[in-house]
């Protein structure tokens, strides 16, 4: 799931023409829409963020996300976007370019993503090539659509967080 949700985040919210981002912006919800997947914790979190949205749009935000994801789960996600997401993340993995951060430090932090919660598999994220191959094989099978259904649409655990700025408190 670690990489699969990174791919879903890319295809749904980051890629050019990403359908979930487009649906929220077309509905006038927020000026900037983004997503993230935090997998370095025991219970991973998939977030959808609409910046500069009105509090009154909360229900529209929820229904737009649910309706769009149901449609995508039923009709299928754009296969080109999935392949692009896989290629993007595989390229980043193979290049191992961490900018100004020391490579060893970044590898150590990657190890913690699994090692903290499964002492038997500290290197699982370092050996990702088979996972990329698996994900490529799953593009045409409905695997990603099932992830949307199981882990987002049919998941009873979720939250809506509204952060309101207070004028003059910058």
Task: For the regions a language model picked out, list residue spans one by one.
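Amphipathic heptad-repeat coiled-coil/leucine-zipper-like oligomerization helices
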Residues: 151-155
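Glycine-rich active-site loop/lid that clamps phosphate-bearing ligands
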Residues: 2, 20-21
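Active/ligand-binding-proximal structured segments within catalytic/core domains
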Residues: 2-12
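M16 family metallopeptidases and their MPP-like homologs
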Residues: 21-136, 156-169
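Extended non-catalytic domains of envelope/secretory-pathway proteins
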Residues: 141-142, 168-170
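Extended alpha-helical coiled-coil "stalk/arm" regions that scaffold and mediate dimerization/assembly
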Residues: 138, 143-150
């Amino acid at each position: 799931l670690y990489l699969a949700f990174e791919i879903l985040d890319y295809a749904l919210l980051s890629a050019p023409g990403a359908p979930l981002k487009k649906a929220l912006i077309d509905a006038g919800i927020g000026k900037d829409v983004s997503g993230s997947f935090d997998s370095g914790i025991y219970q991973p979190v998939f977030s959808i963020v609409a910046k500069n949205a009105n509090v009154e749009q909360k229900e529209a935000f929820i229904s737009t996300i649910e309706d769009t994801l149901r449609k995508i789960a039923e009709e299928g996600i754009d296969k080109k976007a999935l392949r692009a997401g896989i290629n993007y993340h595989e390229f980043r993995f193979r290049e191992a370019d961490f900018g100004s951060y020391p490579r060893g430090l970044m590898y150590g932090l990657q190890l913690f993503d699994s090692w903290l919660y499964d002492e038997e598999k500290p290197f699982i994220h370092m050996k990702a090539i088979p996972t990329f191959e698996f994900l490529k094989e799953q593009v045409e099978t409905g695997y990603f659509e099932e992830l949307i259904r199981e882990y987002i649409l049919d998941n009873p655990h979720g939250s809506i967080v509204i952060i309101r700025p207070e004028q003059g408190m910058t």
